[in-house]
Amino acid sequence: MKNIFKKDWIYLLLLVGLAILTFMQVANFRFGFFTAYDEAYFLLKLQEAYDMSCITGKSQWNLIAVHWFPYLDLTSKVNSYLASSILIWASILVVTITSCILFDKKRIIKYLALAWLFMFGLGGGLSYVPMQTAVLCWALCAFLLYHKSEIVWKKSLYAVLCGICLGFSLFVIIPAALVLLVCVAGLIVLSHWSDWRKMLLYIASGVVGVLLTCLYMHIIVCPLGDILEAMLFTATYIGKSGYKYDGVSFILQYGLFFRDCLFVILAFVGSYWLSKRVSIKWLGGIVYVVMILVYTHYQVKPLISPSMFMMSLPLIPFLFGKINNLKWNDLKKADTWFYIFIFAYPLLASFGTNTALSGRIHCFVVAWLFLWLEYEYKYPQENYRRVYIAVLILFAMPLLDIIKAFENRDDSYHFTRGNKHFAGIALTEKQVNYFNNVYNILEDYNYQPKQSAILTALYDYCCLYAFDAVNAANYHQVQNFHYFPKENMIAPDFIFLCKWDSIVMGQELKDMPWGWPDDFDRYYVGTPEPDNASWVNHADLETRHLYCRKSLKKLQ
C-alpha cells in the first residue's frame, strides 16, 4: 500500500485539487440564473413530470429523473444541479471501477483521478444532457467489460447491462441510442462470426437488457403507449417546422464537422511525419497544437472548439503506436474496429440533437481515456508526463470558470415575490429589477400564480418559472409554433413577444380567437440579460414586449 501511494502521489494531489474545485462548484449552485435559454425550460419540464398533467417531447428524461431522485424536489435549481452532479459522480465511479478491472486493480487512485479529470466540469442543471452523458458512459463501460471478458456468462451479463443503459438512452435521445445499438450489434457479429451460437446469445442478452428497461419504464415510470404517443406528437410538429431537426440541417452540421475533422487528420499526419524524421520526439505534438490553434482562429465558425481539437492530443501516442503496427489485413479484425468504435464514440453518442457538436462531444471524451490507458498499459516504458500536462491544460477553462464564478458571488439580490424555489437563487441587480418591473405590471392585471396563463417562447420561460405561471403552450421554439396543434393551447392572459417572435407568430396570433393585439395593452420590458452576455442576441431581446389582456386590468 505504501508503494502505491508513493507511486501515485501526483494523483493524490490531483484528487485533492479536484475535490476542492468540486466543492466550489457545488457552493455556486444557488448563484446565477441563465434567463435567456434553457435553464427555466428544463425546470418547467421537471415540474411537468411531477404534475403528470401532460407528457410531451421526444425525450422522456424528465420522467426518468423524478423516479431516479424521489427524495429531491427537482424543480429547485439547487436540487436540479445536485442531481445532475450525482449522475456525473456515479459515472466517475463506474469509469474508475471499469479501469481497475481492465488494467490494474492496485491503481484505483490513479484511475479515480483521471476519470474525475476527464469528466470535470460536466453537469450543470438536470436535463437530457447529463442524463445522456451518464447512461452512455455506463453503456460504454459495460461494453468494454464485455469485450475484455472471456467467460460466457460474464459476457452475457455485461451485454445485458449494456442493453439496459442503451435502453434508457432510447428514452432520452433516440437517434444516438439507435446508432450505438447498431454499432454494438455489428461488433458482436464481427467478433463471433465463426460461432453463431455465441453471437446469438450475446445479441439476445443485449436485447433482453433493452426490454428490461422498457418494462421498467412501462411499470414504474409511465405506460409505453402514452410515451410513444407523446414522442410521435412532438416529432410530427417539430419535424414539419424543419428547424435544425430536418435531414438537411443534420447533413450540413455533420458535413462542416467532418470538414474540421479532415484538417485534424491532415495536422495529425503532418505531425506524425515530422516526429518520424526528427530526433526531438515532442516536436510533432507542438506543431500539431500550433496548427490547430491557427486553424480555429482563422476558420469561420469552426464546428469544433480549440479545446476539443486539442483533446485528441493525449491520443497521439496511442494512434502513433497503432499506425506503426497496423497492417492491411488488420482491417478485417474485430479488434481494429473495436478501437475505431471507441475513438468515434464521442461523435456517435452526440448524434440526434440540434445543439453544437463541439459542446456535445465534450461530454463523452471519457471514451478516449480508455484508449490512452490501453496504450499506457501495453507500453509502460513510454514517458507520459508531457501528455499529463496537455490534459491538465485542456481542463483549464472549466477550472477558471468555477474560480471566477466563486469570486464573483453576490448574495444581495433575490426575487421573492413568485416561485419559492426561485426566491433562493442569487441573481444580478439587473435581473431582480427586471422581474420586479414585470411582476408589477402583471399585478395591475390581477395576475394569479398557478392560475394565470402566459404565452411565451424560449427566451421568456424564465418568467413562467419565476412567476409560477401556467404555460399556455409547450411549443418551445417560435419556429415550431406554426405546426403546434392549436387545440392544445390555453387562451393566454399575458403574452411575451420580441420582434422576431412577432414576425414569425404574428399572423397566426391574430387568427386565434384571443383578440390579439387589439384586446391587449402593450408594455416594453427589455431583457434581464447582462449587457456583455455573449450567449444572447441583444438586438432582438431589447425589443421584448409584454402584452396584458385589457379586461383584466384593475380599476384605478
Ranges and model annotations:
Residues 76-81, 113-135, 171, 292-306:
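Aromatic- and kink-enriched transmembrane "portal" helix at the membrane-lumen/periplasm boundary
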Residues 120-121, 155-174, 180-185, 207-208, ...:
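Membrane-interface alpha helices of multi-pass inner-membrane proteins
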Residues 59, 63, 72-93:
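Loop-to-helix entry region of an early transmembrane alpha helix in multi-pass inner-membrane enzymes
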Residues 400-483, 492-503, 538-539:
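Short periplasmic/luminal acceptor-recognition loop of GT-C membrane glycosyltransferases, typified by
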Residues 27-45, 53-68, 74-75, 224:
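Extracytoplasmic catalytic/substrate-binding loops of multi-pass membrane glycan-assembly enzymes
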Residues 1-5, 148, 179-211, 215, ...:
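Perimembrane helix-loop-helix junctions
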Residues 107, 142-168, 196-204, 280-287, ...:
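Short hydrophobic alpha-helices at membrane interfaces in multi-pass membrane enzymes
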